[in-house]
Amino acid sequence: MLKRLLKRPSLNLLAWLLLAAFYISICLNIAFFKQVLQALPLDSLHNVLVFLSMPVVAFSVINIVLTLSSFLWLNRPLACLFILVGAAAQYFIMTYGIVIDRSMIANIIDTTPAESYALMTPQMLLTLGFSGVLAALIACWIKIKPATSRLRSVLFRGANILVSVLLILLVAALFYKDYASLFRNNKELVKSLSPSNSIVASWSWYSHQRLANLPLVRIGEDAHRNPLMQNEKRKNLTILIVGETSRAENFSLNGYPRETNPRLAKDNVVYFPNTASCGTATAVSVPCMFSDMPREHYKEELAQHQEGVLDIIQRAGINVLWNDNDGGCKGACDRVPHQNVTALNLPDQCINGECYDEVLFHGLEEYINNLQGDGVIVLHTIGSHGPTYYNRYPPQFRKFTPTCDTNEIQTCTKEQLVNTYDNTLVYVDYIVDKAINLLKEHQDKFTTSLVYLSDHGESLGENGIYLHGLPYAIAPDSQKQVPMLLWLSEDYQKRYQVDQNCLQKQAQTQHYSQDNLFSTLLGLTGVETKYYQAADDILQTCRRVSE
């Protein structure tokens, strides 16, 4: 009996190809078909037929690809690859509402082991185990019967391809206009179709990565210090905090009814309520905000081999340090001193390869004490990175309850999820306030300033969307509107003639974006170069002209 159960089932090659094509094109594209139903109401027989034609086209395309690969004996490995990739894509699309594109592939490549571990849930392991790994094993386990005639096998496979091509042509003849209209008006639909979404996105990512080895493009070689901010006994020190996944609408400084920024509310900061990000993922936003390119003209491939604002500041003679607690600077700090403080794995600060952001201050006091010239310190925080929001703050910052203490955030109630996310912002508030107090402690030696700017926002289940990374054109504002604030010491305001009341009024009426960071940092640190754009410098219009 057992022997009979363990006996490998056998199919002829054509049947195996059809079965594999059906599973890949239909079973692993449920997410795609669900999204089609949202965009194509089945309110007429015509629309019903259009919808029913889509599985036919998907099946036919996969059938053609697998059949062609069988002539090179690649049908098994290719089918297994499609199954594994399709199962993974479908899980993340259906669970988190993401889109598979180049940015998402970059996010996957840049994901740290700790972040990968945070995504692992029993649901994920079971889903991928059954729909991916088990299905691939079955595809390999099924025995393909040897063809009785090689010519007959070739003819049958040729006929199989021909029938599939004819089906595609028939659908095109009947419904081309419907397809063109549907996909033109819903451009992101195709990014849910597996396995083409993963293949196209991976190739796009690879094409961009190839350009990373191009010669470095230097900018700001004319950089020099403004005489007003140089050769003074009191040096200048600026801290820039790069936030992670903090969305503006949950900042109490932005009018959010919950008190998520109790400390910063007392710090006399200037908050900019209308600030847009350059992207919806760290891999896009961080290199973009440090580049001289505005979002509308941002080129990822150029940013990978071009200097940014930190290079210019360093060239002008200012000491630059980047402390990282978020898996890397995405190229923004490659040519300035930088350190991965997460790797220190400090006790009471780190859990499973991830650390609370307070680790960023390790050794900072000593660094500042030994600093002889002007300095810019960048603190790259892990902030509110999900889905393990509950791991982003120590227990004493669990202000709002009940919380979502799991990485299966889709299983939590809205209240639990928002509570946990808001707790991360309470800890962000603590971190930024701590940096301000650190600067205050060194005001005897330095004229100090601080900027906080988050890389992108976050979705917390609104409209079934979680996390971030959606294409900018369709991403909700919660992923694009980010908190930005500025703190200037009284000494800075007086010494460099900056009117803070003017800044406060300007912040409430003007719209800003991460495009402003480049020139604002140059202006804040007194670096002059032809790349500086006064119109993008937030402080420029509020500087009083000395009589």
Curated annotation (Swiss-Prot):
Keywords: Antibiotic resistance, Cell inner membrane, Cell membrane, Lipid A biosynthesis, Lipid biosynthesis, Lipid metabolism, Lipopolysaccharide biosynthesis, Membrane, Transferase, Transmembrane, Transmembrane helix. Coiled coil: none annotated. Pfam families: EptA_B_N, Sulfatase. It is a multi-pass membrane protein. The chain crosses the membrane at residues 10-30, 48-68, 80-100, 124-144, 155-175. Residues 31-47, 101-123, 176-547 are periplasmic. Its main location: membrane. GO terms for cellular component: plasma membrane. Catalyzes the addition of a phosphoethanolamine moiety to the lipid A. The phosphoethanolamine modification is required for resistance to polymyxin. Has been isolated as a 91 kDa complex containing ZipA-EptA and an unidentified 24 kDa protein. PANTHER family: INNER MEMBRANE PROTEIN (PTHR30443), PHOSPHOETHANOLAMINE TRANSFERASE EPTA (PTHR30443:SF0). Belongs to the phosphoethanolamine transferase family. EptA subfamily. This is Phosphoethanolamine transferase EptA. The gene is eptA.
